[in-house]
Amino acid sequence: MAKDNIHPNWYPEAKVYCDGQLIMTIGSTKPELHVDIWSGNHPFFTGSQRIIDTEGRVERFMRKYKINKN
């Protein structure tokens, strides 16, 4: 038995926007959701993911502990 007037409103057609563009509609407690990243533009899901290794962790480790590559 749910209590009256304590539960948030449910919006079954809440709109999700990314960069001002409508992405999808979902059920939510807010009528509109604005997101920065979603599966359509996330590098992992789009296949454009790059491994960023600015200094080279292995090289930095080897230099720190004075290990020579053979």
From Swiss-Prot:
Which cysteine-cysteine pairs are annotated as disulfide bonds in the entry?
Answer: none
Q: How does it assemble?
A: Part of the 50S ribosomal subunit.
Q: What is this protein called?
A: Large ribosomal subunit protein bL31c
User: Quick one: where is this thing mainly located?
Assistant: plastid
Instruction: Extract the GO molecular function terms from the UniProt entry.
Output: rRNA binding; structural constituent of ribosome
Instruction: Give the UniProt family note.
Output: Belongs to the bacterial ribosomal protein bL31 family. Type A subfamily.
Query: Which species is listed as the source?
Result: Pyropia yezoensis (Susabi-nori)
Superkingdom per UniProt = Eukaryota
Q: Which BP terms does GO give this entry? A: translation
Q: What's the name of its gene? A: rpl31
One Gene Ontology cellular component term attached to this UniProt record is: ribosome
Localization terms from the record: Plastid, Chloroplast
Query: Its biological function?
Result: Binds the 23S rRNA.
